[in-house]
Design a protein with these regions (language model features):
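Canonical WD40 repeat/beta-propeller blade segments in eukaryotic WD-repeat proteins
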Residues: 11-20, 59-71, 107-152, 191-199, ...
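Surface-exposed loop and turn segments in beta-propeller and other repeat-based domains
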Residues: 54-57, 285-305, 318, 426-448, ...
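C-terminal scaffolding/assembly regions of large eukaryotic complex subunits
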Residues: 478, 624-626, 667-813
Length: 813
C-alpha cells in the first residue's frame, strides 16, 4: 500500500475554559477559548465517548467564562453560559443558536453557580441555621435576607448566582414556564471584583469559593494553596499547599468526602476527608497525625496535562441501554482473556463517579473519583477540534486530487500532486510539508505490499527515511466575515463547486481556471465565482453534493433538508425527516450532523446527533426508510459502499459496524451474521471512529475504518474470527506485533528476481487488522485502490503554538 501524508495543516485547537455536567450526569458541556461549545456523551468505558454537538464560536471577543446546566423539560436540562462581555446566554441544543440573552449590568461575569436541586436540599441538615448572621465578606455571604426564607420555599424555578466584575453577586431565576431568565435580586457590593461563587448544599448561603457536600467551604488562591473553611463560622480549618502555581479550579465528589484541585502547574490534586476515628488507613495519608481530629489530607496528584488546568467537573457514566437491535445475538466462544492493566476500562463502570479535567493544552482527561491514584487517566479527545478535510479524487480541473480544508473562518483549496517515482527498498510513504521540517521521522504507518493481500507488513522503525513529495499547491482561499465562523462545508466530486455555511446562511462558489494566465499552477491561475442560493435558507448543520455534482443538499437548523439545483439555483425539494419520538411528542427536530449520498445518485442518508438515520430516494424525492438509533448509540461515521449503491456502512460510538441493505430496508447478510459478535480487539478500538474510506473499485469488498489514533482494515468478503482465542495470555496487539523487526534490507532480506521485497506475513488469515498511528489523524481516504492519503499533524508541533506553561525544572538538567 502506498501511503501519502499531508502535515502542513494549520491546526491550533482552542483551550478549554469551562466544564459543566448535565442534570442527569450523562453529558458534559465543554467551552473553549474561541467561544465554541461541545456537548460530549459520557460513556461507562473507554469506548463510547462521543462529541454529539458542536456550537461554533460567534466572534473573536466572545469569551465564555462559565457553564451551568439547569433543570428543564429534557433529562439533560438547559445549558447556560456566561461571557466576559457581561451577558448570560441560554443555548438551543436543536438549532445550535442562542435562545435567550440577558445582560448582567455588572461588567464581566467571572463565574456562575446553579442552585442545588430540591432533592439534595431535603437530604441536607444543618444546625442553628436561624441564628446565622449574614456574612458579606470574601469568604461567605448570605444568599437571602431575613424575610426571604418564605420566598425560597414558594419559589419553584431554579436560581443561578452570578459573580460580577463590579463586586456584586446577582441572582437570576431560570423560569420553566416562560422559558426565560429573569433577574431576582442583588447583594450589597463589596470592594473589588467577585471572581468565584458557589451555593451551599441547602441553598441558604452563597460562598466565594467551592462547596462540598458536608458544608465545608473550599477555596484556592494564587499561592497554590487549597484552603478548607468552616462555612458556619467563617474560620479556616486547614490549608494545603501542593501546587506550584495558581489554583484555577475546584471540584468535589457527590458524597462530599473528596475534593480535587487543579492549577497552572498542570497538576490535579486529590484531598480526602478522614475522620479522627480512622485507624490504620490514616497512616498512608500525608498531613494526618496520630490521634488527630477530623481532617482533610492530601492523597496524591497526577500531571497528564502539559499546560494550565482551568476546569474540573464530576460526571456519572451513562448506564448503557440497548436500543432496538435488528440482528440476532450470537454466543461468543470461550477463550483466554488478556489481563487488563491499570487502564480506564477497569474503573469506568456505571455508578462510579468520574472526574473530567480540561486546560490550555485543549485536552480532556477522565479520572476515577473514588480511586484517583490507582488507574491511569483516559484521554477523551486525542485530536481536539480536528479540521474538516474533503478530497475530490478525480476532479475535472487540475492535475491531481483537490483537497479542501475547513478552518474556523476560512477554507483552503489545494491541489495535491501525486507522483509514483519510488525506488525499491525505499519507504512507500510521502510526506507533504511546506515548511521542510521532515526531520528524521523514525516511524509512521507500517507498509503493505498490496491492498488486496493486506496482511504483509514490515516494521517501519527500521526504515531509512520518508520520501518527500511535492507540497500541495494552494488554489484558492475562501474567507467569511470575522464575526461569523464556518459551521460546515462541502466540495463536489468534480472539485469545481465549494459550499459552506456560517451562522447566517449557506454560500456557494464555483472554482474556475483562468486560461489567460498561461499556467495552471499557483493561486493566481484560479478564480472563484460566487453563486446566489435561493432565499430563505437558514444556517446549515451539514451539507453534501450529489455524486454527479448537480445538486447541493443542505440540512438547515430548522431540521429540514433542502435540495438545490446548482445550475438553475432553484430549490427542487424540501425533505421533512420523520422521527418517531419527535412526531409523537411534538418536540423540536434534533440537528442533522451527517449527510452522505450513494455513488449512483439514488440515495441520501441523513443522520442526526442521536444516531437516527433517515434514508431518502433522490430520484422520486421521497423518504424511503427510517432507522432508529442502532444499539442505542450515536453514529460516528457512515458511507455508501462503491460496489453497490444500496449498501450503507455505519459505525456507532460503541464501535459496532452495521451493513444496511437500503433497498430491502433491512440489515445486510454480513451484519445479521457478525455484528453481534465482532472481535474484542475492534470493540476496544482506540479512539472514536471518525471516518470510513472505501477503495474506488466496483469489485472492492473492504473498508478502512479509522480514528485519530488507529486504523482498521475490514474485509466484508472474509469471515470474522474471534482472535482472542489465538493470543497467548498477556499478549496484546501492539505496534511491534503488527510487523516483523527482522525483515528488511539491513538484516539481509532476500531480494527476488522481480525486484520486490519479501515480507513475513502476519495475521494472514485474520480480518479486522488494526494498525496504530503515531500522530493524530484528521482525515484518511483512498486515492486509488493501492494508494491512500493521510492528513495528520504531530502533537509536538501543536503544543509549540500554545502559550508556554509554568516553568518546571526537570531533574538532571
Amino acid at each position: 500500500m502506498e501511503v501519502h501524508r499531508v502535515r502542513s495543516i494549520d491546526w491550533k485547537p482552542a483551550c478549554v475554559v469551562a466544564l459543566a455536567t448535565s442534570v442527569d450526569g450523562t453529558q458534559v458541556a465543554v467551552a473553549r477559548e474561541d467561544g465554541s461549545i461541545e456537548i460530549w456523551k459520557v460513556a461507562p468505558g473507554s469506548v463510547g465517548w462521543h462529541c454529539q454537538l458542536t456550537i461554533t464560536g460567534r466572534r473573536n471577543d466572545y469569551v465564555i467564562s462559565s457553564l451551568v446546566w439547569c433543570r428543564g423539560s429534557s433529562a439533560s436540562g438547559r445549558l447556560l453560559s456566561a461571557c466576559l462581555d457581561g451577558t448570560i446566554s441560554e443555548w438551543d441544543l436543536f438549532s445550535l443558536q442562542q435562545k435567550t440573552v440577558v445582560e448582567s449590568f455588572g461588567g464581566s461575569i467571572w463565574q456562575m453557580a446553579v442552585e442545588p436541586l430540591t432533592e439534595s436540599r431535603e437530604t441536607y441538615s444543618t444546625k442553628n441555621n436561624d441564628d446565622d448572621d449574614e456574612k458579606e465578606n470574601g469568604v461567605s455571604a448570605s444568599s437571602s435576607e431575613s424575610d426571604s426564607d418564605q420566598e425560597e420555599d414558594n419559589l419553584v424555578e431554579q436560581r443561578i448566582a452570578v459573580a460580577c466584575d463590579d463586586g456584586c453577586v446577582r441572582i437570576y431565576v431560570v423560569c420553566d414556564s416562560e422559558d426565560d431568565i429573569a433577574y431576582y435580586k442583588s447583594f450589597p457590593r463589596v470592594k473589588g471584583r467577585i471572581l468565584s461563587v458557589a451555593w451551599s448544599i441547602d441553598a441558604k448561603r452563597i460562598f466565594a469559593g467551592g462547596s462540598d457536600g458536608d458544608g465545608t467551604l473550599v477555596s484556592g488562591d494564587s499561592t497554590g494553596t487549597t484552603q478548607f473553611w468552616d462555612s458556619q463560622q467563617g474560620t479556616q480549618l486547614q490549608a494545603r499547599t501542593y501546587h506550584k502555581g495558581d489554583v484555577l479550579a475546584l471540584a468535589s465528589t457527590p458524597n462530599g468526602q473528596g475534593v480535587f484541585s487543579a492549577g497552572s502547574d498542570g497538576q490535579v490534586a486529590h484531598y480526602k476527608f478522614v475522620s479522627g476515628t480512622t485507624k490504620s488507613s490514616s497512616d498512608s495519608f500525608e498531613g494526618l497525625a496520630a490521634g488527630a481530629r477530623d481532617s482533610w489530607v492530601f492523597v496524591g496528584s497526577k500531571r497528564v496535562h502539559t499546560h494550565d488546568v482551568r476546569a474540573l467537573t464530576l460526571a456519572m457514566p451513562l448506564i448503557f441501554e440497548k436500543g432496538e437491535f435488528l440482528g440476532e445475538p450470537t454466543n461468543k466462544e470461550r477463550g483466554y482473556r488478556r489481563p487488563a492493566g491499570l487502564d480506564y476500562r477497569k474503573w469506568a463502570i456505571p455508578g462510579v463517579p468520574m472526574l473530567i479535567s480540561g486546560g490550555n493544552d485543549a485536552k480532556l482527561f477522565a479520572y476515577p473519583a473514588n480511586r484517583f491514584l490507582d488507574f491511569n487517566p483516559h484521554d477523551i479527545c486525542p485530536a481536539p477540534q480536528r479540521v474538516f478535510v474533503q478530497v475530490a479524487r478525480k476532479p475535472k480541473i487540475g492535475e491531481g486530487p483537490i483537497m479542501m480544508i475547513q478552518y474556523s473562518s476560512w477554507l483552503d483549496v489545494s491541489m495535491t500532486k501525486i507522483s509514483t517515482d519510488l525506488e525499491v527498498g525505499k519507504r512507500k510513504s510521502r510526506d507533504f510539508d511546506s515548511e521542510d521540517n521532515v526531520k528524521k521521522q523514525s516511524c509512521t504507518l507500517p507498509e503493505s505490499v498490496g491492498h488486496q493481500s493486506g496482511r504483509y507488513f514490515r516494521d517501519n522503525r527500521r526504515a531509512n527515511s520518508l520520501v518527500k513529495g511535492t507540497p500541495p499547491t494552494l488554489l484558492a482561499t475562501i474567507k467569511c466575515k470575522k464575526s461569523q465562523h464556518i459551521i460546515c462545508s462541502a466540495m463536489s466530486e468534480s472539485g469545481h463547486l465549494i459550499a459552506f455555511s456560517d451562522r447566517i446562511k449557506p454560500h456557494l462558489y464555483k472554482l474556475k481556471f483562468d486560461s489567460s494566465t498561461g499556467s495552471n499552477v499557483g493561486e493566481d491561475s484560479w478564480r472563484l465565482k460566487k453563486k446566489s442560493l435561493p432565499e430563505g435558507l437558514s444556517a446549515s448543520h451539514s451539507m453534501v453534493f450529489s455524486a454527479d455534482s448537480t445538486r447541493l443538499i443542505i440540512a438547515c437548523n430548522d431540521g429540514k433538508i433542502h435540495v438545490v439545483d446548482v445550475d438553475s439555483l432553484e430549490l427542487l425539494h424540501t425533505f421533512d425527516p420523520f422521527i418517531e419520538d419527535i412526531m409523537e411528542h411534538a418536540m423540536p427536530r434534533p440537528p442533522i450532523t451527517r449527510l452522505c449520498t450513494s455513488g449512483d445518485g439514488q440515495w441520501l442518508a441523513a443522520i442526526n446527533c442521536y444516531g437516527d438515520v433517515n434514508i431518502f430516494n433522490l430520484e422520486i424525492l421521497r423518504q424511503h426508510w427510517y432507522i432508529s438509533r442502532l444499539d442505542g448509540c450515536s453514529v460516528t461515521a457512515a458511507g455508501f459502499h462503491p460496489s453497490s449503491g444500496n449498501v450503507l456502512v455505519v459505525t456507532t460510538s460503541s464501535n459496532h459496524v452495521y451493513v444496511l441493505d437500503v433497498d430491502a430496508k433491512q440489515l445486510g447478510e454480513w451484519s445479521k451474521r457478525y455484528t453481534s459478535g465482532l472481535p474484542r480487539r475492534f470493540l476496544e478500538f482506540p479512539g472514536e471512529v471518525i471516518g470510513l474510506s472505501f477503495p474506488p473499485s466496483p469489485k472492492a469488498t473492504s473498508v478502512i475504518v479509522h480514528s485519530s489514533k488507529a486504523m482498521c482494515l475490514i474485509d466484508f468478503g472474509k469471515p470474522v474470527n474471534q482472535d482472542d482465542n489465538d493470543l497467548r495470555n498477556g499478549e496484546t496487539i501492539t505496534f511491534e506485533k503488527l510487523g516483523s523487526a527482522n525483515h528488511d534490507l539491513a538484516n539481509g532480506d532476500e531480494k527476488p528476481s522481480n525486484g520486490k521485497l519479501k515480507y513475513k506475513p502476519v495475521f494472514s488469515d485474520k480480518n479486522f487488522v488494526i494498525l496504530p498511528l503515531r500522530y493524530p489523524v484528521h482525515f484518511l481516504t483512498h486515492l486509488s485502490e493501492r494508494t491512500i492519503l493521510i492528513v495528520e499533524k504531530p502533537w509536538v508541533d501543536v503544543l509549540q503554538k500554545f502559550k508556554a506553561p509554568v516553568f518546571r525544572h526537570v531533574f538532571g538538567t
